[in-house]
Swiss-Prot record:
Function: The alpha subunit is responsible for the aldol cleavage of indoleglycerol phosphate to indole and glyceraldehyde 3-phosphate.
PANTHER family with a match to the protein in the record: TRYPTOPHAN SYNTHASE ALPHA CHAIN, CHLOROPLASTIC, TRYPTOPHAN SYNTHASE, ALPHA CHAIN
Protein name: Tryptophan synthase alpha chain
Keyword terms: Amino-acid biosynthesis, Aromatic amino acid biosynthesis, Lyase, Tryptophan biosynthesis
Family membership: Belongs to the TrpA family.
Reaction catalyzed: (1S,2R)-1-C-(indol-3-yl)glycerol 3-phosphate + L-serine = D-glyceraldehyde 3-phosphate + L-tryptophan + H2O
Subunit structure: Tetramer of two alpha and two beta chains.
Residues at the catalytic site: E49 (proton acceptor), D60 (proton acceptor)
Recorded GO MF terms: tryptophan synthase activity
A GO CC term attached to the entry: cytosol
EC number(s) given by UniProt: 4.2.1.20
Amino acid sequence: MSRLQTRFAQLKQDNRAALVTFVTAGDPDYDASLEILKGLPAAGADVIELGMPFTDPMADGPAIQLANIRALQGGQTLAKTLRMVREFRAGDSDTPLVLMGYFNPIHHYGVERFVTEAKEAGVDGLIVVDLPPEHNEDLCHPAQAAGIDFIRLTTPTTGDERLPTVLEGSSGFVYYVSVAGVTGANAATLEHVEEAVARLRRHTDLPIGIGFGIRSAEHAAAVARLADGVVVGSALIERIAKAGDTARAVKDVLALCGELAEGVRNAR
């Protein structure tokens, strides 16, 4: 079993959801970002999504757009992001790590080179927001052939007739974007989330992670009662932006992760 399969299977046995945390590689700088990454599992993160900075993150809201800018201005590159994963893996062989971002930087890096180096670094999965199933040959198939899960996004506007196409070839887990729009937008109602999870379960046996708009331990707990994973990104990123210095940024992000983890673990 892959690290993602193992983690979700274990959590299912424990009757709780996964806390999935998103941070942008290189934000606020390389060293602090690596420190955050290394600290997340002990703070309570079950799965980590690491953003690959890009100049035009069109699906992301203001908080993550600014994180991309901070990271890129600090010199973060895709090669450095893969190095960061290797450094993380040197001390953690258990926590699943997923790279999330856009196809353009991967295309420029070279798909074959990227997939090979990502696998060697210890990447478990990919979420590429601007690569629909019609382009599976571009990255999904090469990644899965190398043993890297390819995680699809579904949204409130993904109809029943479209879902099988989106889910075909998906692996790892399904990421349900509970609000149509950019990341960090207002949270969806729990009733809406419950209906969406039920609809997705009719189409897939994969674990379902819910993201976009989750900001507090209470909200995380409420979503954790309905889904297999609770994805939090913008709320963590905002702590970095407000911190003022890197040491405070590390401390504040890990503190919020701890609060969210407590909410998720006490949910059921």
